[in-house]
């Protein structure tokens, strides 16, 4: 990787409605997976790149997001830490607008590219998928602001449709929240030995948990109202992340290649 390209320590992958990059410097990045628009800024004295997950010209649906391009762009700009934001439906009755710090995931996706290694076998270890240091920083930030949160398991579905009641009944046996974008991001980050963690906001109750019809409007409405809060949480967390990585994420790819 060209040293001149290493302009960021930390990457933020913004989900639906995330617009905290609007006043930042645009920085297009060419990757093997296409062109990615990134935004450079400084938060709490740390160099940060913000990458809108769904792009901007159009809202790319979750099953067609350029996950490889986004993670590669973060890596190519020098980021070793990645924080993602995503919206989730709750299968545990979490209040709408509340936050979940993810601690594990289950993958129900089907057709999206999920690895950088199509021509060789790489069995990357995901026994601890989310970086403990970033997760600790997120918990610190939430607690500092007196914001209630939970930790939980994330089920990722293919989308773009919402889930059926039967699917939610099945997934609720194993997971706490459900979304459409957290995988393969987390795996791709592991393949590049990056630290990765997610801050999820509950935007609705999952299908069948209430009698209310699920709509995309409620997702954008909840996230829109929480924009200022999300940015403050991320800012405090970014300032708390250790400058030197002491977690095992940096060794994720060791011994993985056949």
From Swiss-Prot:
Statement: the UniProt record of this protein carries the keyword DNA repair: no
Gene3D superfamilies from the UniProt entry: Nucleoside phosphorylase domain
InterPro entries: MTAP, Nucleoside_phosphorylase_d, Nucleoside_phosphorylase_sf
Pathway(s) of this molecule: Purine metabolism; purine nucleoside salvage
EC number: 2.4.2.44
Site note Important for substrate specificity, residues: 163, 216
Quaternary structure note: Homotrimer.
PANTHER family given in the database record: S-METHYL-5'-THIOADENOSINE PHOSPHORYLASE (PTHR42679:SF2)
Homology family: Belongs to the PNP/MTAP phosphorylase family. MTAP subfamily.
Record's protein name: Probable S-methyl-5'-thioinosine phosphorylase
Organism expressing this protein natively: Methanosarcina acetivorans (strain ATCC 35395 / DSM 2834 / JCM 12185 / C2A)
